[in-house]
Amino acid sequence: MPRHVLNKDLWGGAETFDALLADIRARRREFERNRRISADIVERFKEIGVYRALVPKEFGGDQKSPMEFLMMVEAIAAADGSAGWVASFGMNPAYLAALPPETVEKVWANGPDVVFAGGIFPPQPAKRVDGGFLVNGRWQFGSGCHGASVIGVGRSEEHTSELQSH
């Protein structure tokens, strides 16, 4: 198979993947009206391996190539741009790479199908407390937060020295 053609076998097979795309296309207005991708679509993304695609094999992931991942995202985005965004943004290894290994192990302790969401801007203040950090603020949006397993947030730089390496 040419490298520039999406291999649907990597994503649950042609029948499953095409049915997902058809369902996404049919429900675009619903997603727009609700201002979110429905939970059942996020679950189907998990089933076909969207969120474990780039997770290293040592953590139970599929460790697919970036090209394979992006071709899948492109197909979903062609069906609905917001669904493509939630599929691509929910992929978490890129965001977790900066964390200490023991934190990454905790995130994937129950399996690689972890859905990431983020409300990064504007950064908000964080304070060290027993057992972690207290983050207080309001983020204007958090892409994919309704279907997320883990939510990353931006913290203000005024606390950098206190929070480094955590």
What kind of feature is each model-predicted range?
Residues M1-M71:
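Alpha-helical interface subdomain recognition
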Residues E158-S165:
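Conserved small/polar residues in nucleotide/adenosyl-binding loops
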Residues A39-E47, R52-S149:
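Glycine-rich flavin
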Residues R138, R155-S156:
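Fold-independent oxyanion-binding glycine-rich loops
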Residues A53, S156-E158:
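Generic structural motif
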